[in-house]
Amino acid sequence: MKLIAIDLDGTLLNSKHQVSLENENALRQAQRDGIEVVVSTGRAHFDVMSIFEPLGIKTWVISANGAVIHDPEGRLYHHETIDKKRAYDILSWLESENYYYEVFTGSAIYTPQNGRELLDVELDRFRSANPEADLSVLKQAAEVQYSQSGFAYINSFQELFEADEPIDFYNILGFSFFKEKLEAGWKRYEHAEDLTLVSSAEHNFELSSRKASKGQALKRLAKQLNIPLEETAAVGDSLNDKSMLEAAGKGVAMGNAREDIKSIADAVTLTNDEHGVAHMMKHLL
């Protein structure tokens, strides 16, 4: 195996959003063995750097669900953007329907100033409708969103279209605790010919250019590095990893992955709290 593409949340990162020592050592060993380690995530590149710079590990990074590729030195290699008019229409709808949203750009993740309030209101509504429900899981899902670095806060999405410098729209995320709101997002965009629609967690949906996906980015990078796809592996847990697992020579699902991801994988490793990435590198490749 000459290249391994690795998802972050639910895969390389454990439930505490950390890279375990076992996984860290596995990455270093792979690099010593001459394997090209690639981080492939829905997160923004600068957010990935906040995790990897303290570790002193440099890799190629596929970010924003495949919309952006940076080389190990942090230089932009390739990007695919959402058409600005399309981005305006998407954000106008999300804001009018009171979604918590995130806009991934090259410089920041833009989110509403009242974003936490929007989710707090949803939590209160959810609690009222489901008094017996355990809200800790929902609160943890919200904390995953808040734990990212590089946030910039806006009063309205329209500020992004009034900026002095034009903004590249890489990825737009909608988030809700309510199934019907998530389904409304899927229904609205699932047949859009110019967009890729995926999800990286139970409570979100994410939109990027039709030319952007983790699978397409993996193919592009493998070609750039002159590595046959048969000599690549990919590991992930969520719907946004599906194209990557299908594109790679060997697709590996995490033990904590969705069942539909496990069903298309060539192998299943341990969970992200059991150092599943390290286990994969040692036993499954």
Swiss-Prot record:
Chain residues that bind phosphate: L8, T41, G42, K214, N240, K282, H283
Keyword Magnesium: yes
UniProt-annotated catalytic positions: D7
Domain of life (superkingdom): Bacteria
CDD domains named among the record's database cross-references: HAD_Pase
Sample GO molecular function, one term: phosphatase activity
Named cofactor requirement(s): Mg(2+)
Binding-site list for Mg(2+): D7, D9, D237, S238
Keywords of the record: Hydrolase, Magnesium, Metal-binding
Gene Ontology cellular-component terms listed: cytosol
EC number: 3.1.3.-
Similarity field: Belongs to the HAD-like hydrolase superfamily. Cof family.
Cited function: Catalyzes the dephosphorylation of phosphorylated 5-6 carbon sugars and monophosphate nucleotides (NMP) in vitro. To a lesser extent, dephosphorylates flavin mononucleotide (FMN) in vitro.
Protein name in UniProt: Phosphatase YwpJ
Native organism: Bacillus subtilis (strain 168)
Gene: ywpJ
